[in-house]
């Protein structure tokens, strides 16, 4: 697991020059890339979510584009359109921001449904359809979408089909007191988040991510642990506080993220703790809490922890 370990260590060290704290954010963004998935980042404004993704793209030498979602955003604004050139009366493709490697979709819960549907095709198929013609996207194409908590004005919930396309949902919280002091001290010393060149970031070799992905996929999952993953997923479907449990797609994602966690830890095999650690980020956005449980103050994370405790761990 040399490539994964090298990549993980480098990403954490270099991102630490720009993003203070937020270790879970760094790890789960890396997991997203290792598993070739997409990530939904939820947190209030001002927690460095866009900065983290921009820094990640710089470190990996990948192209970066950003879409700021508004209620009038059209599908053509993100996928592109054919434009007529008057000089020769021919149509030429004007590529939208999805033709990139890392796409930051800021405040995705302000995006209108038609545009969400266009983005869904990009995420699921890694291709776009423009005027009936299909165009392939990069194998590195990854969506990092941010959203504010649902009780913020002007936002609305994403449909289940859209949520299920995100490998993980990353909850970005406030930094600790010591981390916030370090952050302010860094800014006071002259750090400018808009000038990443001044951070002296050291990018990794271009093929390191490709090698790391292959290593993560090669991690062994014993039959007993595959059964454990299935039991966890099936238990969520029967859990009284949930109206919607984890789908088979979610179970596959749970196994893949557990493999990547094992690889980051330098192991060639998955252990039960990898599955437990993957459970919350992989499933918290795929299950639906019943209204009566929500009124009692229960949230998806609490319920998933109860599910983990209820399922016997393989030995």
Report residues per predicted region.
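C-terminal engagement/docking regions of AAA+ P-loop ATPases
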Residues: 1-2, 9, 236-315
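Pre-Walker A (pre-P-loop) alpha-helix and adjacent loop at the N terminus of AAA/AAA+ ATPase modules
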Residues: 2-47, 234
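Conserved alpha-helical scaffold flanking the Walker A/P-loop in AAA+ ATPase domains
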Residues: 28-31, 84-104
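Walker A/P-loop
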Residues: 33-70
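Conserved beta-strand position immediately N-terminal to the Walker
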Residues: 39, 103, 141
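Walker B catalytic acidic pair
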Residues: 43, 106-107, 118
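P-loop (Walker A) phosphate-binding loop of NTP-binding proteins
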Residues: 44, 78, 146
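Canonical AAA+ ATPase core
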Residues: 85-90, 111, 123-219, 259-264
